[in-house]
Every structure is written in C-alpha cells, then in structure tokens.
From Swiss-Prot:
HAMAP family: Hfq (MF_00436)
GO biological process: regulation of DNA-templated transcription; regulation of RNA stability; regulation of translation, ncRNA-mediated
Keywords attached to this entry: RNA-binding, Stress response
Function recorded in the entry: RNA chaperone that binds small regulatory RNA (sRNAs) and mRNAs to facilitate mRNA translational regulation in response to envelope stress, environmental stress and changes in metabolite concentrations. Also binds with high specificity to tRNAs.
Biased composition (Low complexity): 74-86
Family matches, as NCBIfam families: Hfq, PRK00395.1
Source superkingdom: Bacteria
Gene: hfq
Family annotation (Gene3D superfamilies): 2.30.30.100
Designated name of the protein: RNA-binding protein Hfq
Pfam families assigned: Hfq
Family assignment from sequence similarity: Belongs to the Hfq family.
Gene source species: Alcanivorax borkumensis (strain ATCC 700651 / DSM 11573 / NCIMB 13689 / SK2)
Length: 93
C-alpha cells in the first residue's frame, strides 16, 4: 500500500459508511454530487439518481457536506488536516 492510501482509504471509507453527501470536483472543473457507494485503488462509485464510476485520476477535490466522525484513525481525529507536509507534496514523487 502506498503512503497516499493511508489517508485516502480511511477518509473515503468513513464517507461511505456514514453516507455523507459529497461534492466531487473533477480536474476539468465539473462538479459531481452524491454519496460514495464504493471505491477501489482506481475508481470511486458515486450514487445520486444514477451510479457513476469516476476515475480517481480525474478527481481534483472531494468536499464532504460534513466532517466524518473520527473512528480510531489519528489522521481523521479532530483538528487533523488532510494537507500534506511541505516535503510530501505530489511534485516530489
């Protein structure tokens, strides 16, 4: 499992389990809304009136309607931020 999944998977899973509505912004600017039904390494299944399979490489931002509860994951504890440290940005891979 890569380092990025240690934050991404618990966050998406909490949004899925709690059925929190999300807005997903794509890299081309399109805004999708719904609930995360499922996800894997490459795609997110977003459910609204219909289910849409959205490739993760096309996603810019995931904005939940509310914060998920922290469930034993220190990365999701109150006050924790999702922003990478200065030396952990995507440009340094």
């Amino acid at each position: 499992m890569s380092k990025g999944h240690s934050l991404q998977d618990p966050f998406l899973n909490a949004l899925r389990k709690e059925r929190i509505p999300v807005s997903i912004f794509l890299v081309n600017g399109i805004k999708l809304q719904g609930q995360i039904e499922s996800f894997d390494q490459y795609v997110v299944l977003l459910k609204n009136a219909v289910s849409q399979m959205v490739y993760k490489h096309a996603i810019s931002t995931v904005v939940p309607a509310r914060n998920p509860r922290a469930t034993g994951n220190p990365a999701m504890a109150a006050g924790a931020t999702a922003a990478p440290a200065a030396d952990e940005g995507y440009g340094n891979q």
